[in-house]
Curated annotation (Swiss-Prot):
One of its GO terms (cellular component) is cytoplasm. It catalyses: L-glutamate 5-semialdehyde + phosphate + NADP(+) = L-glutamyl 5-phosphate + NADPH + H(+). The keyword NADP applies. The keyword Oxidoreductase applies. It holds the Pfam family Aldedh. It is an enzyme of class 1 (oxidoreductase). NCBIfam families: PRK00197.1 (NF001221), proA (TIGR00407). Its EC number is 1.2.1.41. GO terms for biological process: L-proline biosynthetic process. This is Gamma-glutamyl phosphate reductase. The gene is proA. GO terms for molecular function: glutamate-5-semialdehyde dehydrogenase activity; NADP binding. Pathway: Amino-acid biosynthesis; L-proline biosynthesis; L-glutamate 5-semialdehyde from L-glutamate: step 2/2. It comes from Erwinia tasmaniensis (strain DSM 17950 / CFBP 7177 / CIP 109463 / NCPPB 4357 / Et1/99).
Length: 417
């Protein structure tokens, strides 16, 4: 089954690679229109997936990731239209020049070929990834989680209908519809056809892909994100950022999980933090130094464990730790962070500069919420993933991250001496 999917995807990638920007944009506009026109089919499938997920005891955070409604589906379609408006990187000449040999040489952006994406209960990923891959002339094989297989299958059928309307093979976007986990292992070995693999899920999935895949893997998306609260902050401004970073969408991988607070402001900041978190419905998990102070406030608070520092809450829960200085804060991030998104709230330029230079994350913020680590927010359009590694891409992966390059040389019957 997967061998045939791989063959078909590779063949489709050759046809996609020579489409003009205008042709790709017309195709994407049709996909966006069909997603809205056929929304009833997708939403009905999603309701079935949601019913099964609730019956199986899925957490509220994961249910939120899984759920689609007309508003979210319209937002997904609008994201596809936004991809149409983005500059096409394919064919762009990165650099080049005339050589002493007489050759005129250039380095030109080209599609990767076939991209494989493994993801969990995120039906929006199906469309986001497909639109970015099509814009860059790549075919894609999608393997969503068993929780979303009906939603994904319905969505891909709509996309394939749009492909056929434009004379593009349906195999340009394929979904592995079976929830059988053995098919994941088979996909990991499909290096004859698949050029890059992107897992979007938990640590277990990332570990499996790194250890078992014969395809180059881009890992990321696990977000144990921190905010360091410096002694020089303005209290109300800091609380506003913290609430946004935690509450706007707690199930997102760029939501904050741990606050590191300069102990010098504990007596004034922790009572205010407790009051605001109680107001927002956010539970706190405190270290031994902050726990007694926080227990005097109205927020729900319990003792934090070492394991909780290492995991994503993806819910209205927030770790709190007092640190003696910025050095201790940076050391904690190095020990427990996932190199996703980390922020400092400060009015001290020296501290901001040091944090930016010493925290080795894919996105580092000064006086801003971690929630901005997103392809759309960064002006990249929909993202295929957020990479926390350093090769071949880092941070939100937009269009350029789905390309590679080739060297093209032009001669005049030129030979090497």
């Amino acid at each position: 089954m997967l061998e045939q999917m791989g063959q078909a995807a590779k063949a489709a990638s050759y046809q996609l690679s020579v489409l003009s920007t205008a042709e790709k944009n017309q195709l994407l506009m049709t996909i966006a229109d069909r997603l809205e026109a056929q929304s009833a089919e997708i939403l009905a499938a999603n309701q079935q997936d949601l019913a099964d997920a609730r019956q199986n005891g899925m957490s509220a955070a994961l249910l939120d990731r899984l759920m689609l409604d007309r508003q979210r589906l319209k937002g997904i379609a609008d994201d596809v239209r936004q991809v149409c408006r983005l500059a096409d990187p394919v064919g762009v000449v990165i650099d080049g020049g005339k050589l002493d040999s007489g050759l005129r040489i250039e380095r030109r952006r080209v599609p990767l070929g076939v991209v494989g994406v493994i993801y969990e209960a995120r039906p929006n990923v199906t469309v986001d990834v497909a639109s970015l891959c099509l814009k860059t002339g790549n075919a894609v094989i999608l393997r969503g989680g068993k929780e979303t297989y009906r939603t994904n299958a319905a969505t891909v059928r709509v996309i394939q209908d749009a492909l056929k309307r434009h004379g593009v093979p349906a195999a340009a976007v394929q979904a592995i519809e079976s929830p059988d986990r053995e098919l994941v292992n088979q996909l990991l070995k499909l290096d004859r056809y698949v050029d890059m693999l992107i897992p979007r899920g938990g640590a277990g999935l990332h570990k499996l892909c790194r250890e078992q895949s014969t395809i180059p893997v881009i890992t990321g998306g696990i977000g144990v994100c921190h905010i360091y609260v410096d002694r020089s902050i303005e209290q109300e401004a800091a609380l506003k950022v913290i609430v946004n970073a935690k509450k706007q969408r707690p199930s997102a991988c760029n939501s904050v999980e741990t606050l590191l607070i300069d102990a010098a402001i504990a007596d004034s900041f922790l009572p205010a933090l407790s009051a605001r978190m109680a107001q927002e419905g956010i539970s706190l998990h405190a270290d031994a130094r902050s726990l007694p102070l926080l227990q005097q406030g109205p927020a729900c608070v319990s003792a934090v464990t070492d394991a909780q520092y290492r995991d994503e809450w993806l819910a209205l829960d927030l770790n709190v730790k007092l640190v003696d200085d910025l050095s201790e804060g940076i050391a904690h991030i190095r020990e427990y962070g996932t190199q996703h998104s980390d922020a400092i709230l400060t009015r001290t330029i020296k501290h901001a500069d040091r944090f930016v230079n010493e925290v080795d994350s894919s996105a580092v913020y000064v006086n801003a919420s971690t929630r901005f680590t997103d392809g759309g927010q960064f002006g990249l359009g929909a993202e295929v993933a957020v990479s926390t590694q350093k090769l071949h891409a880092r941070g939100p992966m937009g269009l350029e991250a789905l390309t590679t390059y080739k060297w093209v040389a032009f001669g005049d019957d030129t030979v090497r001496d």
